[in-house]
Regions:
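Charged docking surfaces used in two-component/phosphorelay signaling
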Residues: 15-23
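Short hydrophobic/Thr-rich beta-strand motif most characteristic of the beta2 strand and flanking loop
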Residues: 25-32, 40
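Acidic catalytic/metal-coordinating carboxylates
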Residues: 33-36, 59-65
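Active-site beta3 strand of CheY-like receiver
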Residues: 44-50
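Receiver (REC) domain active-site loop signature in two-component systems and cognate sites
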Residues: 55
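Alpha4 helix (beta4-alpha4-beta5 surface) of REC/receiver domains from two-component response regulators
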Residues: 62, 85-100
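A Lys-centered signature of the CheY-like receiver
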Residues: 104
Length: 107
């Protein structure tokens, strides 16, 4: 079974994303900020990380940079899912190692 870590400070977004991913047979874990997400990745590296940009404690971008620097052999796919919708954010995310970039709100 594929695994996904949802990293978002919004409980509502995490709940909706969890519901969608579980219907697609993903095993889902959640984190409310980047620091918590790093801890969860150290315990069990997911296949996919669904990542918000703006969060307290540690942003999604900080998390992504630290995750990629650690150079784990089993690096997850990282999909930013954020309200940041300008080209500068998109370019920065992709250059830092994000695999995809999806803008909220989404249908």
């Amino acid at each position: 079974m594929k695994t996904c870590l949802i990293v978002d400070d919004s409980k509502v977004i995490r709940k909706v994303a969890r519901h969608i991913l579980e219907t697609l047979d993903f095993q889902v874990d959640e984190a409310g900020d980047g620091r918590e997400a790093l801890t969860r990745c150290e315990a069990a590296m997911p296949d996919v990380v669904l990542l918000d940009w703006n969060m307290p404690v540690m942003s999604g971008m900080e998390f992504l940079k630290l995750l990629r620097q650690r150079g784990h052999e089993d690096q997850p796919k990282v999909v930013f899912c954020t309200t940041e919708n300008d080209m500068a954010h998109i370019r920065a995310a992709l250059e830092a190692g994000a695999d995809e970039y999806v803008m909220k709100p989404f249908d």
